[in-house]
Design a protein with these regions (language model features):
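All-alpha prenyltransferase/terpene-synthase fold signal
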Residues: 1-137
């Protein structure tokens, strides 16, 4: 068994890589179907406020936030609302802001790995970090 310190480091790695993976998944949900092979904007259609939209909601005033939340509530019935919110997220920098947060989580995961001696296992986990940051599906 690993020491408590090593266990805590691996927990931090797992949480960080998991958050990065989820944020990348949220970003990919805004991309076109041809790129991912699955329908886009499912999160909007399911009224899920993921990080790309959340960063936009946090950056606008109260009146604008209420308007965007009302649009989100209509996403299951109106493609126009889905397209509108996608446009807002893209043009207000929501995906870029989310990508920066994802990179911060990946940096945390990589910093954990620096606490370990070089090995094929550490290299495999580092490669996983690269994959999560670059995946497009």
């Amino acid at each position: 068994g690993a020491s408590r310190e090593k266990q805590a480091l691996m927990r931090k790695f797992g949480e960080s890589i998991g958050m990065a993976f989820q944020i990348q998944d949220d970003i990919l949900d805004y991309t076109r179907t041809a790129r991912t092979g699955k329908p886009s904007n499912n999160d909007l259609r399911e009224h899920k406020v993921t990080l790309p939209l959340l960063t936009v909601l946090e950056s606008v005033g109260e009146e604008r936030r209420r308007e965007l939340q009302a649009r989100l509530a209509r996403c299951h019935e109106e493609d126009e609302s889905v397209e509108y919110l996608q446009h807002i997220v893209e043009n207000e920098g929501g995906m870029e802001k989310a990508a920066r947060v994802m990179q911060e989580y990946l940096a945390r995961a990589m910093s954990v790995l620096s606490e370990y001696e070089p090995s094929e296992y550490r290299d495999a986990l580092a490669n996983l970090c690269v994959y999560v940051g670059e995946r497009d599906r």
